[in-house]
Amino acid sequence: MDTCSQESEPLQTKESPINNAGKTPLVLGNGKLVTPHKQAAEMTPNCYTSETFKSPLNFSTVTVEQLGISPESFVNNSSGKSSPYLKKSRRRSTVGLRGLPETNHLIRFVAEQRSLKNASLTQTSPFQGSPALYRNVYSLREQMSAFHLAFNSIKENEKMTDCPEFSEAEGVFKTRGSTKKESLGECQLSEFSAQSSSKRRRLSSPSSSDVNLTDAVDLQACGVNMAACPSTDMKCAVETCAGLSQKSSASGLNLQCGCLMNESPLLSELTEASSGIQDAASVEERGSNDAVSVDKCTEVSTDTAPEVRSLVTPLCQKDLPSSKTFVLRSVLKKPAVKLCVESLQEHLDNLYNDETCPSLTSSLANSCKEQTAALPNTKKRKRVTFGEDLSPEVLDESLPANTPLRKGQTPVRKKDLSSLSPPLLEQSPVPEWLPQPNFDDKEENLENIEPLQVSFAVLSSLNMSSIAETLSGTDTSASSSNHENIAPFRVGRATRTSDRRSKLISFSQESVCNLLNAEAQPCKEKKTNRRKSQESKHADKVLPRKNRVLKGCKKKKGKGKRKGVQKSLYGERDLASKKPLLSPIPELPEVSETPLVGSLVRRTYPDDFNSNGKFEEMMLPKRENLLSQDPEDWQVIQGFNKDNASESCSSDMKSSSSFSNATFEQDANINSIEMDENENIPKAITLESENERKTGTECENSHISCTLVTVTPVVSDNPKPDFPLQSQELSAAGQNVENLFQIVKISEDMNIKCEKQSGFSVIPEDKLQTEHLIPDSQKECDCSEDVLTDQRKVSKSQGEDLGRNSAASCSGVSDRERKYRGHSVGGSDGPGLHLERTNNLQTSYSMSSLVEISLENSELCKDLSDSIEQSLQRTKSETKVRRSLRLQKSLEREGGLVWVSPPPPPASCTSQRTKRRTVGTLDSRGFEPVSSRQDPCTLPSTSSEENGEGFTAAPDASLPGKRRRRSFCTSTLANPKSTTQSRGCKRRSFLGQKRENTLQETSRESDLSEN
């Protein structure tokens, strides 16, 4: 009742600051948020509740107002202010929060109800009915008293009639407990922990025999705190420890020793005394009650320890110091199992020294064998058993791994234990086996701690006679030799080291173990080696791929940022994917045409061999190695019309050098594509073959170059020719852009070269033409023309037959011109011809070539000059297209993407040319290098007239090389400009399909050239 009044005061004190609080909201200790406007509404209910709380509330009849809850507590009476505090207060409810008075009283009410239920069972207890113990639990005194009362009330009341002395002692404890526990400031137990522990023990106390070791340890702490008081209070503390439960430190030992525990505390005391574990604690406590305990021993525990009855009093008289030490140890160290065993050992040592009861020591040893062995079993999680527990020495580190037990024998540890004679066991049964671990000696630490489990199990399993029989001289000698090194108090004990040595001496297991080790270690090494090898292989397989992927990503990022990409960067493209059809880049009609091209190439080669014989064989290797061939060889081949053709080529190269440099990459790619397409067009091939025949005759007259100028300029000077065709063009027209004059001849020569290089065009006419060209004189003439024709070969893949003869000469010229790579398709007139070329060719050649062209076809020359001028005047094309070169077999080495700029239609001629640009049609040789794209590997596409930078549409079409070579990257003569400007950065879009008229015109022009 006083507690309620005491609580009302702090509530008022907490509420008092509210009156002094200004207009600012305050958070009270009870958790309520109070604002100035809520003061008047909330103060009165709080005062009212404080008065009502003086008496315990009956929650069956209590109202909301009594608890201080009103509608105002849920509604915020704001004065127009919208502060964040007010907003939060609207969303908050203080009902049910921890620390509120109504919540606290509700908790107390529940506690009282529980206490009332238990009151019927504990009516005799003086303090059980008082609610003060439950209400004012914040003080240490009430916490301790409530704990003990809750734990002992039921048990003590049941046994009250049997032991009046104990009830009196309990009353003494309860009277003195308050004062005694006030002095113990160390034991600051929380209310929750005390109640929860009391509940646990209240449930477990009736069946004390099934108490867990953890509960015993927890209770031991409580009992120790009580026992740690002055000697005057020891009796009360110890009696409570014994009376409360056998769960104190001794109770854990009772369970360990396997002694039967009855519900009565007296029986627990008797069993403890019989086991010699808690005799120390019971001595001080009982004092004059020794006789009573002896009587109880005789009554209760006759079956457990009959010898102990007469020995209880002397034990009590003798073990006062040991009991003190035991209590102190239990206070300092919580693990009671080992400490209790140590106390038992000390007690047994004292008994043995006084020679009072040897039989007791033997009985104690026998009783504790299995009990102490059970403890380490629970602690050890992993055990290796062969039908029974093995000694740790079987698995000892010093012994070899996988030490087998001999067939029919128990673990060696048993024989080692047998080294102990029966008198030794009686003299020091336990203390030798359970000493306090010495952490200084690592080996002894292991020896002292681990063998507990096995040692007792072995002692229990073996008979003394069998032990004596199994002993051998080697064992005793080894053990004696080992005992010399042991401290004198351990002389009678066989250590693990001695057992090890005795094993090694008495048994020949060492050799066997070594053999097993020798076998086991290689196996382990093999396994480890295998694992390492597998890991290394796995790392080799996986890690490089990741690295490659990362590198590829970096490269792709770098490429994507660059607009103008050099073909040299794409040299690694072949390694990434050698199969063009699997490329992620969509290929337009060329993909479908490539198989046809391959078949055509195969057809042309045998046809070429049949028609040309040896000459064909010479040309095929040239196709492959044109780039590698020396320019001097080509110059020798050119011999016939070297002057005329070289002049024209030089002029073309000079004029086209600027274009070739710019359009080098683009034209190479485009021309290679055009070559493939042109191969697919048999009609264009036939026209080209006719043109080549004409050009063959013209080459001899050195006028063919002029007519051939109309052939689309071959930008074979471009980067390294990946494809043999482009390489020949580079080599033959080393200045691949010289296409104007060279292309004029190239139109014919390119047809020949196209046949030579890849035989792209399957033309019987070409074969016939090649037969005509087979003569050396024609070859020489063609060689001079082939300087141009090499470029035209790049542009014209179809005109193979005539080009073969001229290709030999052209290939030589192309090698010579390789030195002058970077040539653009030069216009036949003025600026285009006068464009500076990196090559050292003289401008006089260009002039002479122009003259020749004008002599043969003045119209064609005009067209070429116009186209060249237009291409020079053109600015960089706005649009750019990427072109893939991988599908062309001639360009396999330099696969990749090239930016090509589609040139605007320059003039009627250029527009016609752009129209002629086929989307891979099979008409003419399929490649109109109208754009004068310099692809070292690509053959200049379309007719020789178109290949000429002038590329007049009609006259160019007349040339055999003009046979419509619709290339993906078809571009007008302006393309050389665009290529020079964008240079591999722009891609040309597909223009209109070839007109049939252009084919007719090409045939007509070829007829005119032949005439």
From Swiss-Prot:
Q: Where is this cross-link: Glycyl lysine isopeptide (Lys-Gly) (interchain with G-Cter in SUMO2)?
A: 753
Kindly state one GO CC term assigned in the UniProt record: nucleus
Q: Could you confirm whether the keyword Nucleus appears in this record?
A: yes
Q: Where in the cell is it found?
A: Nucleus
Phosphoserine found at: 125, 130, 209, 293, 310, 391, 398, 428, 583, 702, 747, 967
Q: Which residues form the PP1-binding domain?
A: 380-440
Bias class Low complexity marks the residues at 418-431
Pfam families from the UniProt entry: PP1_bind
| Chain positions with Phosphothreonine modification | 313, 403
Comp. bias (Polar residues): 1-22, 931-945, 968-983
Predominantly, its location class is nucleus
Q: Which domain of life is it from?
A: Eukaryota
- Stated role: Regulator of chromosome structure during mitosis required for condensin-depleted chromosomes to retain their compact architecture through anaphase. Acts by mediating the recruitment of phopsphatase PP1-gamma subunit (PPP1CC) to chromatin at anaphase and into the following interphase. At anaphase onset, its association with chromatin targets a pool of PPP1CC to dephosphorylate substrates.
**Protein name, please?**
Cell division cycle-associated protein 2
For this protein's source organism, the top of the classification is: Eukaryota, Metazoa, Chordata, Craniata, Vertebrata
Q: In the UniProt record, what gene is named as encoding this protein?
A: CDCA2
